């Protein structure tokens, strides 16, 4: 009865909402499409002025019960609906009956629970008459992890017809010369500057991706120093530190080709699904499916002017320390192994995933401890221990070491309107303290206010010395947030000087 499109990040749901607007924007169908996540305000139907009470009650009930024909949401929200024990999780669960669910970028799930995911999805599809479509650039065959019958149909019988077609396969050249040497940030900078010099006349869009956030910051400062103030090249930095506003102010001009000469330094947040088309890429190696995702950001529209895109891989930070529990970080499964370079070139990811599945079965699925499958199904699932099931199936493990902080300042939006963080914060406080307002109206208005607050929201490490002005629950607010920005970019050094430290990864 419903269609769910599920993405790894909230921003991708909004991005695809805009894509659907170009298709259905002039029809009534666009009103049936809703984005459901923590960033998007609750949407009502009709005119609020005609009957406010009815408007707000229906809007809240629609959100709580997912009463929309077409829903765009995130992996986290979907898995809470499927396995969560909260009130709203339970209220929306029945909407999965008879639905079509499209799971995009499935390789981004924690592979420690791939087996459990496949077993549950297979069972739910049968019991609830769901059609689940799994999508990914690399598409692991997770049915291999399930003992017994798994009702899986491969929609593309001959994927090589597309992946090996010259238009697709030859659009990007992978270069491994930097993997042959002990790379440093200074050596990488020289290499990038050489490529910039070669493209000085024609221009180019260069994407440089690091695993660690601090490394991205360090390289950004090195490049800024090398370019100087008079350079024609736009130098941008995009990490998990950036707010939604900052992220879009960087990506939109790149998408629309406003900048002909641009260097975007980033962490891996640009890999999965972000709609940008770059000419040259540099990437610190990690998981093989991450490398393929990165290739999808290069020469996205095909070969330009007879020149294919090119990606230089290097090995700087130790990815295995970051992805500690990910079996895909076995050295033999990375680009450090020449066999994996062939797999990447020929798109033979089934060969790669066969080895990953072997590791999963041998290292985890056969365990008899609490981490093993047998223990989980006999002690948690069979005994209907819903809290333990919910905990096991969390896609993102709970992080108790960070807090959210609102850095108030004034932002000019694309349409010319101004958003004042301090005024939005005051409005947020007023709504919370208004005990006379109807519950439905309050929930809807709070969702709208929180959506605006997200423009000023940042995550930092938990620290009792945070120099905040106000605190509501565990949400901190700094009135003069502008002091922590320089050239429209968060000043990490200034923040850390005031004992506010960003999350490292």
Please report, for each region that a protein language model flagged, where it lies by residue.
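Conserved Walker A/P-loop ATP-binding site and its immediately adjacent core
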Residues: 2-24, 37-40
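Interdomain hinge/linker at the junction between the two RecA-like core domains of SF2 helicases
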Residues: 138-199
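Short basic/glycine-enriched coil/helix segment immediately N-terminal to the Walker B
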Residues: 64-68, 85-99, 261
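SF2 helicase motor core recognition
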Residues: 81, 263-278, 293-301
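Inter-Walker segment of RecA-like/P-loop motor cores
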Residues: 26-83
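C-terminal helicase lobe and adjacent C-terminal extensions/tails of nucleic-acid helicase motors
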Residues: 125, 190-204, 209, 214, ...
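Conserved helicase motor
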Residues: 34-46, 211-214, 235-248, 266-271
């Amino acid at each position: 009865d419903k269609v769910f499109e599920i993405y790894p990040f909230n921003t991708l749901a909004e991005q695809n909402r805009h894509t659907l607007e170009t298709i259905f924007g002039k029809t009534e169908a666009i009103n049936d499409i809703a984005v459901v996540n923590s960033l998007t305000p609750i949407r009502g139907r009709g005119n609020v002025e005609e009957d406010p009470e009815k408007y707000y009650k229906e809007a809240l009930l629609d959100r709580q019960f997912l009463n929309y024909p077409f829903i765009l949401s995130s992996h986290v929200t979907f898995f809470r609906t499927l396995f969560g024990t909260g009130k709203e999780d339970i209220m929306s669960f029945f909407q999965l009956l008879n639905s079509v669910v499209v799971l995009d970028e499935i390789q981004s799930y924690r592979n420690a629970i791939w087996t459990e995911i496949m077993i549950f999805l297979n069972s739910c599809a049968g019991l609830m008459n769901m059609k689940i479509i799994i999508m990914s650039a690399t598409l692991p065959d997770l049915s291999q992890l399930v003992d017994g019958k798994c009702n899986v149909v491969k929609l593309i019988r001959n994927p090589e017809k597309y992946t090996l077609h010259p238009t697709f396969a030859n659009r990007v050249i992978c270069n491994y010369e930097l993997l042959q040497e002990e790379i440093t940030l200074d050596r990488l900078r020289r290499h990038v500057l050489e490529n910039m010099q070669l493209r000085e006349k024609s221009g180019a869009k260069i994407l440089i991706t690091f695993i660690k956030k601090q490394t991205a910051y360090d390289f950004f400062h090195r490049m800024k120093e090398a370019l100087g103030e008079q350079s024609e090249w736009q130098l941008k930095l995009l990490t998990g530190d950036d707010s939604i506003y900052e992220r879009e102010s960087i990506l939109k001009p790149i998408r629309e080709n406003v900048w002909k000469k641009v260097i975007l330094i980033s962490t891996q947040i640009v890999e999965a699904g972000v709609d940008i088309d770059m000419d040259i890429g540099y990437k610190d190696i990690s998981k093989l499916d991450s490398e393929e995702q990165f290739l999808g950001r290069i020469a996205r529209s095909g070969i330009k002017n007879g020149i294919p895109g090119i990606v230089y891989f290097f090995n700087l930070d130790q990815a295995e320390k970051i992805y500690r529990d990910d079996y895909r970080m076995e050295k033999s499964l990375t680009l450090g192994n020449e066999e994996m370079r062939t797999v990447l070139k020929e798109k033979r990811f089934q060969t790669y995933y066969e080895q990953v599945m072997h590791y999963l079965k041998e290292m985890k699925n056969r365990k008899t401890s609490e981490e093993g499958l047998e223990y989980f199904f006999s002690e948690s699932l069979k005994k209907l221990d819903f809290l333990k099931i919910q905990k096991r199936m969390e896609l993102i493990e709970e992080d108790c070491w960070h807090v959210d902080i609102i850095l108030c300042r004034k932002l000019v939006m694309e349409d010319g309107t101004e958003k004042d963080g301090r005024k939005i914060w005051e409005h947020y406080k007023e709504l919370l303290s208004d005990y006379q307002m109807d519950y439905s109206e309050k929930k809807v208005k709070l969702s709208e206010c929180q959506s605006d607050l997200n423009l000023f929201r940042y995550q930092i490490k938990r620290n009792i010395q945070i120099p905040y002005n106000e605190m509501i629950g565990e949400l901190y607010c700094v009135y003069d947030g502008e002091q922590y920005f320089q050239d429209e970019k968060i000043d990490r050094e200034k923040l850390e000087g005031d004992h506010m430290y960003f999350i490292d990864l």
